[in-house]
Amino acid sequence: NRSMANLTENFNYLQPTSFKLVLDRRNYPNLEFFCQSITHPGMILNPVELGIPRLSGIPIAGESLTFNELSTNIILDENMQGYGEMYNWMLRLVNNNLGSGSGKGSIASDTGVPDYADITLSILSSHNNQTKQVRYIDCIPTSLGDIQFESTADGQTFITFAAGFRFNYFKLV
C-alpha cells in the first residue's frame, strides 16, 4: 500500500514547550533569550474564481501565497533590553526609509546593522534534540506590543510584551 509507506514512524506528539527561537544573535541577543512563545503563522493560497453561469464561482489555485504575521511573546527583563532592541530596530527602519530610501537588505550607515534578519524556529523532540527547523526569511518588525504594569500582581508574574514580524516566506528545513 503506497500511502502506508509515507506514514511517520515517530508517534510522539510535539510538546508546546519544545522550541528554541534564534534571531540574529549579534544584533538582537535578548529577543532570542527571553522569547516566551511564538505563533507559527498560517498561510493562504489566494484562489482565482472561475465564473460559471448559474453556479457560484469555482475556485482555481491562485498564483500567490499570503502569510500571516509571525507573533512572539517576550519576557521583559529589568533593563528592558529586549524591548529596546525591537524599539531601536523599528526606529532604524523608519529613519532609513525617510532618509536614503534604502531597500531590502540595506545596512544602516550609522549602525552597520542590516534592516532585515532571518528568524529560525528550532523544533525539539521530547529529548530536546532538534527535529525540524522553520526559517523565516527577511523578517522586519511590524508591531511592538503594550507593556502593562500592575501593582496588584504577585511576585511570580513576569511582564511580557508582544512583538510581530512580517517576512517574505518560510522554509521547512
Language model region names:
Residues 1-173:
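Glycine-rich, low-complexity intrinsically disordered segments
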